[in-house]
From Swiss-Prot:
The modification Omega-N-methylarginine is found at R119. InterPro entries: AAA+_ATPase, AAA_ATPase_domain, ATPase_AAA_core, ATPase_AAA_CS, P-loop_NTPase, RecA-like_PEX6_r2. It catalyses: ATP + H2O = ADP + phosphate + H(+). Belongs to the AAA ATPase family. The keyword ATP-binding applies. Component of the PEX1-PEX6 AAA ATPase complex, a protein dislocase complex that mediates the ATP-dependent extraction of the PEX5 receptor from peroxisomal membranes, an essential step for PEX5 recycling. Specifically recognizes PEX5 monoubiquitinated at 'Cys-11', and pulls it out of the peroxisome lumen through the PEX2-PEX10-PEX12 retrotranslocation channel. Extraction by the PEX1-PEX6 AAA ATPase complex is accompanied by unfolding of the TPR repeats and release of bound cargo from PEX5. Keywords: ATP-binding, Cell projection, Cytoplasm, Hydrolase, Membrane, Methylation, Nucleotide-binding, Peroxisome, Peroxisome biogenesis, Repeat. GO terms for molecular function: ATP binding; ATP hydrolysis activity; protein transporter activity; protein-containing complex binding; ubiquitin-modified protein reader activity. SUPFAM superfamilies: P-loop containing nucleoside triphosphate hydrolases (SSF52540). Its EC number is 3.6.4.-. Interacts with PEX1; forming the PEX1-PEX6 AAA ATPase complex, which is composed of a heterohexamer formed by a trimer of PEX1-PEX6 dimers. Interacts with PEX26; interaction is direct and promotes recruitment to peroxisomal membranes. Interacts with ZFAND6. It is found in: Cytoplasm, Cytosol; Peroxisome membrane; Cell projection, Cilium, Photoreceptor outer segment. It comes from Cricetulus griseus. The gene is PEX6. This is Peroxisomal ATPase PEX6.
């Protein structure tokens, strides 16, 4: 992509679209009368992601053409500059787009009145953009966010109402003009108090234009900044420059579901404070708080070696600067950083005694050559200012400028110090101080670690060791990283699998080396991931006493009288029960990653999709409900799978031969949204894989249309489950039933009923067969029962369906096992059922053929207190409803009469019998189709039809699965329990 400079043409030609560019004569691109399409993006942005497609037309003559050497100039309107979030003279990267994507479908919004007129030729449009037709806007496009609207585009038109009628241009023109600023500088000496937030780049305070006018300051002016606290001398004032903060380029947001809105405006009452300045001020990075700002008036900078003179006040230059390198686990304190420091101080920097300086190392490979340790290059190196001496050693100045011309730099020794949080530049939600879904966990970690950093923290009793447990992918490492960033602590990550060795002595040596390395860069947190891997022998069966003793000694070994900053240890595990007892008891603090609620899953999805273009039909709230039981890593994997599905959909939407490499490149430049169907397909794939791996619950796809008859049973089930969900205020009155028992002959649809309830009520469904919970090992059967209810609580709202409940919970005292396993399982099941009253959104449905074999305690109020009999269909009307539900997805001939089919069937039929009838008829139809294909009587592409003859043959062979004597026995059981 070639570099180009944007130049505002004012006034812009009225006959030219406002979001087009004019090409100068003699430029690098052919300027023809028909024009071409250019892909533009700011020069500072990475080439990944979508670009802005604009129409490039032939510009005016040589009087407005390019003059002199340098990049070519593009003549643009102010509306295009606002969309790019750039100013006049900004540089962009531009490349011609040979084949812009053609839009297959577009949704247009039109104001009340006549709709859009006839189209004349292709038109380059973008989602959220106003059309040349008055009152019309592009609301949605397929398959790309930008492309050509032509004769082959299918259009859908809807009516715009309210503020949706206004495009971004009209909202800009509707603002009131800014007030005059000629007299606002009369109050420049006053002390102003603003609220600071962590943000901005470099070493300057970032403010908006209106805030800059309100402060009465100029761009680049020096100010004193101090933190406002409870005491007058809460923090030492620091010097900083004031810079105008411009909005950031993000085409995905500008072409996102907000339909052309330019994002949230910057708040005028806020000042954006860089991370290093906030750290030196002593501010909390999560909430910078109130700042006191005053203009610097102590002197003026008059450089002698330059032709111009600035009368703005500025700090003096330092004659000497003494610094110490801050010890860190990410770089060597003994390395040669002369070249890095020289390049950093080539630009004058503000220094004050006691400050921590951040020196970036990006693009500087010299530190790798001189590093005595084999460490990868870290993106920044920290130094602490020990002393700064001005030209007048006895002068009152406390802040200086340091550069390579006026200052002599001295570096000796190292220091132990906290360091500020710096943004990584990747702009991911996991790098924030409060990762979405993990805010409460990070707060708990900070509350445990912070007291040890306060003055006198070494006198606290107990060690600062924390055990963090949670399933894989739940965000344990992310939470620890965020807590360390918030507290300014060094973080040394050590995976415990790297500490494992063939002998106990080797493991002991590696452990001591890891702790020794962490102590050299205190205050620090040593993060031991998967600590359950330590303390076991090579077979993994017995404990390694030597390793356990060493690890316990290292965890508890703290010198209470040491003046050094503390070393804190955080260990993570997904199987806390596998930890040796001596290691487990060495952690006085134990935290568990909480299960993500629906609101937390929504916040994670919103953070992950913040910079992704989504289709208008994507409902993140509904998606969060379907992701019940997911951890943070699962939601991240969902977005990855969705992107792959979207790419596959785009490739499949091309011609028969597929999209060429050039077409794929142009489509990626235009950008394409993630649709609801992409999320649905990815979610199905992920849930299937997750369910097969760990038995996670999922929402079934069974509706009431799949259940024929049983109207009374449906009503009783919905009153038990749906009523508390729709009216939670009834729970305070005690009107709650958490258990429901379905009993009756086999094959009557008890399992199908439970699945249909889960689907209709949007509940996850966890099906448990009774015998699969029984285990030969002592205590494992009870653990399996507890695990089932734990998974259900994690996936709430959820239905636990116990099939064959009589095999899991028979009457106690009658089992034949010598160890009393079944009695303990029944007791554990009763305890879990009693604990459901504290969990509002977990319901239990049991199914059995023999309720008389169940333990009587299960049928008492508060447990399975609602018994519902699901019997066989005895009348033709109910049998017809069941048969119609089964055959609703079949292709039936017009001559098929289900009533006549039922007349040939036995009188007593269950749902399983009718399903067997349809399955037998389908098998007969398949045999007939194969025979006709072999004889050439029928084409294979035609649909398979069920004929009346197929159904009648199956009805003639049908035998009821439940005899009349068995049905009578089930009815006697029903009357027995109904009388209780």
């Amino acid at each position: 992509m070639a570099l180009a400079v944007l130049r505002v043409l004012d006034p812009f030609p009225a006959e030219t679209p406002p979001l087009a560019v004019l090409l100068p004569p003699g430029g690098p691109w052919p300027a023809t009368g028909l024009g071409l399409v250019l892909a533009l993006r700011p020069a500072s942005e990475s080439p990944a992601g979508p670009a802005l497609l604009v129409a490039a037309l032939e510009g005016p003559g040589s009087q407005n053409g390019q003059r002199g050497p340098g990049p070519p100039q593009l003549l643009v309107s102010r509306a295009l500059l606002r969309l790019l979030a750039l100013g006049p003279g900004a540089r962009v990267r531009a490349r011609p787009v040979r084949r812009p994507p053609a839009l297959g479908w577009a949704l247009l919004g039109s104001a009340p009145g006549p709709g859009p007129g006839p189209r004349v030729g292709p038109l380059l449009v973008r989602r959220g953009e106003s059309l040349p037709v008055p009152g019309s806007r592009v609301l949605e496009t397929r398959p790309a966010l930008q492309g050509l609207l032509g004769p082959g585009t299918r259009l859908a038109v809807t009516e715009l109402r309210g503020r949706a009628k206004l495009g971004p241009e009209s909202t800009q023109h509707s603002r009131l003009p800014p007030p005059p600023v000629a007299s606002s500088f009369a109050v420049s000496h006053a002390v102003r108090q603003l609220k600071g937030v962590l943000g901005g780049t470099g070493d300057a305070l970032g403010v908006t234009r209106s805030c800059l006018r309100g402060l009465g300051l100029f761009q680049g002016e020096w100010v004193w900044v101090a933190r406002v606290g409870e005491f007058p001398n809460t923090s030492q004032p620091h010097l900083a420059k004031v810079q105008l903060l411009e909005p950031r380029w993000d085409l995905s947001e500008r072409l996102g579901p907000s339909s052309g809105q330019l994002g949230e405006p910057l708040a005028d009452g806020l000042v954006f404070v860089p991370a290093t300045l906030a750290f030196n001020l002593g501010c909390d990075p999560l909430e910078v708080g109130e700042l006191r700002i005053q203009r610097y008036l102590e002197g003026s900078i008059i450089p002698e070696d330059r032709g111009s003179c600035s009368l703005m006040s500025g700090p003096p230059f330092a004659r000497e600067l003494h610094i110490e390198i801050v010890s860190s686990p990410h770089y060597s304190a003994n390395g040669d950083y002369d070249h890095v420091l020289y390049r950093h101080f080539h630009t004058p920097r503000v220094v004050q005694e006691g400050d921590v300086l951040c020196v970036p190392t990006v693009g500087q490979v010299e530190i790798l050559e001189g590093s005595p340790e084999k460490l990868p290059r870290w993106r920044e190196v920290f130094f602490k200012v020990k002393k700064a001496v001005g030209e007048a050693p006895d002068g009152p100045a406390s802040a200086f400028l340091a550069d390579t011309t006026h200052t002599s730099l001295y570096m000796a020794g190292s220091a132990l110090s906290r360091v500020p949080l710096l943004p990584s530049g990747r702009s991911t939600p996991w790098d924030s101080l409060s990762p979405p879904g993990l805010e409460a966990l990070v707060n708990e970690l900070c509350a445990i670690l912070k007291p040890h950093l306060q003055p006198g923290g070494t006198l606290l009793t107990g060690t600062s060791c924390v055990l963090l447990q949670g399933p894989p992918g739940s965000g344990k490492t992310t939470a620890v990283t965020a807590a360390c960033s918030r507290l300014g602590l060094h973080l040394l990550k050590v995976p415990c699998y790297s500490l494992c060795a063939d002998s106990s002595g080797a493991v002991e040596t590696k452990l001591q080396a890891a702790f020794s390395r962490a102590r050299r860069c205190r205050p620090a947190v040593l993060l031991l991931t998967a600590i359950d891997l330590l303390g076991r022998d090579r077979d993994g069966l017995d404990e390694d006493a030597r390793v356990v003793a060493t690890l316990r000694h290292l965890l508890l070994d703290e010198d209470p009288v040491s003046n050094c900053p503390p070393l804190m240890v955080v260990a993570t595990t997904s199987r806390a029960q596998d930890l040796p007892t001596d290691v487990h008891t060495a952690f006085p603090h134990e935290l568990e990653v909480p299960v993500l609620s629906e609101e937390q899953r929504l916040s994670v999805l919103q953070a992950l999709t913040a910079h992704l273009p989504l289709g208008q039909e994507v409902n993140l709230l509904q998606l969060a409900r379907r992701c019940a039981g997911f951890v943070v890593g699962d939601l991240y994997a969902l977005l990855t799978h969705t992107s792959r599905v979207a790419c596959a959909r785009i490739r499949a939407s091309g011609l028969a031969g597929g999209l060429s490499e050039e077409d794929e490149g142009e489509l990626c430049a235009a950008g394409f949204p993630l649709l609801a169907e992409d999320f649905g397909q990815a979610l199905d794939q992920l849930q299937t894989a997750h369910s097969q791996a760990v038995g996670a619950p999922k929402i079934p796809s069974v509706s009431w249309h799949d259940v024929g008859g049983l109207q009374d049973v449906k009503k009783e089930i919905l009153e038990t489950i749906q009523l508390p969900l729709e009216h939670p205020e009834l729970l305070s009155l005690g009107l709650r039933r958490s258990g429901l028992l379905l009993h009756g002959p086999p094959g009557t649809g008890k399992t199908l009923l439970a699945k249909a309830v889960a689907t209709e009520c949007s509940l996850t469904f966890l099906s448990v067969k009774g015998p699969e919970l029984i285990n030969m090992y002592v205590g494992q059967s009870e653990e399996n029962v507890r695990e089932v209810f734990a998974r259900a609580r994690a996936a709430a709202p959820c239905i636990i369906f116990f099939d064959e409940l009589d095999s899991l919970a028979p009457s106690r005292g009658r089992s034949g096992d010598s160890g009393g396993v079944m009695d303990r399982v029944v007791s554990q099941l009763l305890a879990e059922l009693d604990g459901l009253h504290s969990t509002q959104d977990v319901f239990v449905i049991g199914a059995t053929n023999r309720p008389d074999l169940l333990d009587p305690a299960l049928l008492r109020p508060g447990r399975f207190d609602k018994l519902v009999f699901v019997g066989a269909s005895e009348d033709r009307a109910s049998q017809l409803r069941v048969l119609s539900a089964i055959t609703r997805k079949f292709k039936l001939e017009a001559s098929v009469s289900l009533v006549n089919v039922l007349d040939r069937c036995p009188p007593q039929l269950t749902g399983a019998d009718l399903y067997s009838l349809c399955s037998d008829a389908m098998t007969t139809a398949l045999k007939r189709r194969v025979r006709d294909l072999e004889e050439g009587l029928e084409m294979g592409s035609s649909a398979l039809l069920l004929t009346m003859e197929d159904l009648l043959q199956a009805a003639a062979r049908l035998q009821p699965s439940v005899s009349e004597q068995e049905l009578l026995r089930y009815k006697r059981i029903q009357r027995k329990f109904a009388a209780c």
